[in-house]
Amino acid sequence: MQKVFFIISLLVGATITSAQDIQYKIVYDLSSSDTAVQATVLRQFNNVLKATPDAQLEVVCHGQAIYMLVKNKIYFEEKMNELKIRGNVSFKVCANSMKRNNVDKSELISLA
């Protein structure tokens, strides 16, 4: 998973240097409940926003990753709020994963 993020970062970095006027829209597909992987995604978002402050970023959480956005189970709410304030960052949750994991919409943090 980290290799994928590294490759995406390289591609974004290479593209940034060649075309500064492009509007970037990046969607991360996150399915891991591993907090190290989740922290990597948030770091990558931070890096992208440093390089291209106008980029539109979105994390789509499904599978066990939905717990990244569940109240009382979240590790990174402060970092996620900071990202949301800095740029066009959104966090989405797969409805099928919520149903499968018996998570109600009311259990999600306000960012989701």
Task: Map each language-model feature to its residues.
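Secreted/extracellular ectodomain signature
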Residues: 20-112
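Bacterial Sec-dependent N-terminal signal peptides
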Residues: 1-21
